């Protein structure tokens, strides 16, 4: 399967502390259990599912942060879904098709492109970074920095990780006269395994991490 780095939602205003508390309870398996005495007193603690339901209900989705247009709200999303409809061989009624896709975020039209990677995985949202590509970069940035990608992080840790990757990438780019890769969105026209190819992966991930981290989002390491 390999590593996919999935950006997490960020807490709604006023939910910041509770967001972190629930995250730590769930990820560290510290969900409180009712004792026998608690049960006698009628005291109940929320279950894991109840905590997750509360956690997700109080998030701002990453699609909003990358400013992805939404079907049923934005004109460009309507034009996009209409084109998809016109491409169908078997067409249901247009009204039915639009209703089925109401609320869909069109990530490929997102205005904040640093949050939409070019290194993606099949079957995942377009803003999920295929972290497995970083495995090819051990020889240029070191095993510790690569392995850190496999750790789920909240926003501050995500931003810090991105900044450290960026600093290493900048150093390598300066030494090899490859600074142009920092602002190049698409992969370089070079063979896989070259320093150019590897450095572009590192730059792309660093920018992705910095974008989400500075905007209050962490990421889930899914592997």
PLM features: what roles do these ranges have?
Residues 1-211, 215, 222-223:
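Acidic (Asp/Glu-rich) sequence patches and key acidic residues
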